[in-house]
Amino acid sequence: MSVWAIGDLQGCYDITQRLLEKINFDPAQDTLWFCGDLVNRGGQSLETLRLVHSLRAHSVVVLGNHDLSLLAIGARSEEEQRKVNPDLLRIVLAEDRDALLDWLRMQKLAHVDRALGWMMIHAGLAPKWTTQMAEKHAREVEQQLQGGGYRKLLRNMYGDQPGWSPGLIGYDRSRAIINLFTRMRYCTPRGRIATDDKGTPGTQAQGLYPWFEVPGRVERDLKIVCGHWSALGLTITQGVHAIDTGAVWGGKLTALQLDTDELRVVQVPGREVTGPAPVARAPRRPRERLGRQRSRGNRGNAGNTAVPAKPPVDTPQD
């Protein structure tokens, strides 16, 4: 029996099949851990979602930001749904859409196997969260997603604010938890996420750190595998194993074997793309008062905890 973690699929069905062939995946014996972002941008999101759904008895999935956006789209009106990009539109118009979306909504934000010694998340953890705290906060949001009021949560999850604080309540609390688990790359030592910084370490604004290198972070008792940050590439450091290697951007799709003493990495080439992958911005001037309310002339009400306007229906928050 083997346990494999697999990076962001993002609708790359053919590439996913090639990777499963390369690791000799045997559903009778093996288990797959999918790090989230199953859909969007790859052109075969419906096929990819159906594939992972068909493997549900032999796999574990954590939700990524693109998966949550798909759920939000599925909960909207038919008129709004028809405005999404063609890749996601095929899912919301599919005959089996309800089965697929209902199953996706039941997936986790964090998966823990203490016997194996691993935790899987999509993006990141707050600097002060132990693995036990992370599990607890993940369950809070999972219960909302899996309950009867999930549509309200999906309508209220968009926005960069507020930053995490243990005293948050309501949708502010849920939004902060979702952002940490599904959108995090860089943050301050206090855990304020910087959603505009997406490049490789060294390109971020002053005072920001990769979430797994923040000064003062807690020591964690499990190894962590995650995806989300394609610009980072395959990175193993500080007990964190980041395996989103940009398959959808022409990079590679990565599988990491978790049940061996020596980590085994298997990769296949990603999607052929006609244009360049997104490039990181050059380092910028230090931000002042990061995470606090900005002046009225800047980017709307960035410091207001009220729910911002929704982004376009086909634009997941990265």
Curated annotation (Swiss-Prot):
EC nos: 3.6.1.41
Keywords assigned: Hydrolase
Single GO MF descriptor: bis(5'-nucleosyl)-tetraphosphatase (symmetrical) activity
InterPro entries xref list: ApaH, Calcineurin-like_PHP_ApaH, Metallo-depent_PP-like, Ser/Thr-sp_prot-phosphatase
Catalytic activity as recorded in UniProt: P(1),P(4)-bis(5'-adenosyl) tetraphosphate + H2O = 2 ADP + 2 H(+)
Biased composition (Pro residues): 309-318
Cross-referenced Pfam families: Metallophos
Chain residue ranges for the region called Disordered: 269-318
Start-end of Basic residues biased regions: 282-297
Functional description taken from the UniProt entry: Hydrolyzes diadenosine 5',5'''-P1,P4-tetraphosphate to yield ADP.
PANTHER family for the chain: CYTOCHROME C5 (PTHR40942:SF4), PTHR40942
Family stated for the protein in its record: Belongs to the Ap4A hydrolase family.
Protein name from the UniProt record: Bis(5'-nucleosyl)-tetraphosphatase, symmetrical
